[in-house]
UniProtKB/Swiss-Prot annotation:
PROSITE patterns for this protein: PROKAR_LIPOPROTEIN
Keyword Signal: yes
Organism of this sequence: Staphylococcus aureus (strain USA300)
Family according to the record: Belongs to the staphylococcal tandem lipoprotein family.
Residues linked to a lipid group, N-palmitoyl cysteine type: 23
Pfam families given in the database record: DUF576
Name recorded for this polypeptide: Uncharacterized lipoprotein SAUSA300_0419
Signal peptide: 1-22
Source organism, top-level taxon: Bacteria
Localisation: Cell membrane
Topology in membrane: Lipid-anchor
Length: 270
């Protein structure tokens, strides 16, 4: 009888040791899974944050933004319907030390249903003492067409401005949720969040960019989704898309896109 009791006690202790060890392993696995989930969830949060605006792409008629409202917070004054800011810029280096940068900025005021902005032409030098040559040409949006308000004698430039299309007018991100294994960088103190994906030259957005811009490199680009501010939404921060085709010195080639909703400024508020 004593022998049976000893065997039973031994088995109980053995099972307890196995159970504790098993719990320890389970906890380790749970920690690993939780850590993985945190990384995955952060990537998903970044994509979901961008989806709030990217789901609207392509915005073929920019004036549709007058009827669309973005994220609102306490920064908005009473009665302010807000203003959409849209930017597309393309920069390319044709020789070391100099970057040619061109693009357009447009402010679509939902209070006045008026859109004004400018086309910019700039040369950015490594020697910062030379960086005082940006030219701006005022524009407005009428019937979904860019109207040039300044006199431009260069016919080629004039045509380029009047026929300009923002990236958001032809880009399509319906597959955004399927982007996987992004390189995620976060800084909770700023806060800022970044997801970077290696794209393929067969991607429809990449192909469209190659049709429109003088992209000479055959490199497939990296797509960067960058958030400055609260990942859940903020009128103070901003979100930026960037396609970097080359970062080699003297061959830098980048397309950047920006669409954000924020408070209207001064006289823009009714």
């Amino acid at each position: 009888m004593e022998y049976i009791k000893k065997i039973a006690l031994y088995m109980s202790v053995l099972l307890l040791i196995i159970f504790i060890g098993g719990c320890g392993n389970m906890k380790d696995e749970q920690k690993k899974e939780e850590q993985t989930n945190k990384t995955d969830s952060k990537e998903e949060q970044i994509k979901k944050s961008f989806a709030k605006t990217l789901d609207m792409y392509p915005i073929k008629n920019l004036e549709d933004l007058y009827d669309k409202e973005g994220y609102r917070d306490g920064e908005f004054k009473k009665g302010d319907k807000g203003t959409w800011t849209i930017l597309t810029g393309f920069s390319k280096s044709n020789k070391p030390g100099v970057l040619d940068d061109e693009g357009m900025v447009l402010y679509l005021n939902r209070n006045a249903k008026k859109a004004t902005g400018y086309y910019f032409v700039n040369k950015v030098y490594d020697d910062i003492s030379k960086n005082h040559n940006e030219k701006k040409y005022r524009v407005e949006l009428k019937n979904n067409k860019i109207v040039l308000l300044d006199n431009v004698e260069d016919k080629k430039l004039k045509q380029k401005i009047e026929n300009f299309k923002f990236f958001s007018q032809y880009a399509d991100f319906k597959d955004l949720k399927n982007y996987q294994d992004g390189n995620i960088t976060t800084n909770e103190n700023v806060p800022s969040y970044e997801a970077q994906y290696k794209m393929n030259n067969s991607d429809k957005n990449v192909k469209k960019l190659r049709e429109i811009y003088p992209i000479t490199t055959n490199n497939s680009p990296n797509l960067k989704l960058y958030i400055d501010g609260d990942i859940k939404g903020s009128s103070v921060g901003y979100k930026k898309i960037e396609y970097k085709f080359s970062k080699d010195k003297g061959q830098e080639t980048t397309l950047r896109d920006y669409l954000n909703f924020g408070p209207s400024e001064g006289e823009n508020v009714e």
